[in-house]
Amino acid sequence: MVKSAEVRRRKKSWVGKVVSDKMDKAIVIAIERRVQHPVYKKYFKKTTRLMAHDENNDAGIGDIVKVTECRPLSKRKSCRLVEVVEKAK
């Protein structure tokens, strides 16, 4: 019998802008990235929205935050707030 080695991998982290903080202990962040069209070679922006766990309700709308992946906390939440990089003005 062959034993499979348990491989630990580094958790992914993202920096994004908070677009919603209406929920208790949860935020929605938008992560923008630039993608090149495969045929026309033009660059355009794509936005991914993630829900993240915010234990102390620190983040507000417009804040730039850093999140990291974690175990699934609910149906749509599998990220955790690490830090608020920049507060909104």
Swiss-Prot record:
An MF annotation (GO) of this entry: rRNA binding
Cited PROSITE patterns: RIBOSOMAL_S17 (PS00056)
CDD domains reported for this sequence: Ribosomal_uS17
Pfam families from the UniProt entry: Ribosomal_S17 (PF00366)
Function: One of the primary rRNA binding proteins, it binds specifically to the 5'-end of 16S ribosomal RNA.
Complex and partners: Part of the 30S ribosomal subunit.
Gene name of the record: rpsQ
Protein name (record): Small ribosomal subunit protein uS17
Paired cysteines (S-S): none
UniProt keyword annotations, A-Z: Ribonucleoprotein, Ribosomal protein, RNA-binding, rRNA-binding
Assigned protein family: Belongs to the universal ribosomal protein uS17 family.
A single Gene Ontology CC term: cytosolic small ribosomal subunit
InterPro entries to which the protein is assigned, alphabetical: NA-bd_OB-fold, Ribosomal_uS17, Ribosomal_uS17_bact/chlr, Ribosomal_uS17_CS
Gene Ontology biological-process entries: translation
Gene3D superfamilies: Nucleic acid-binding proteins
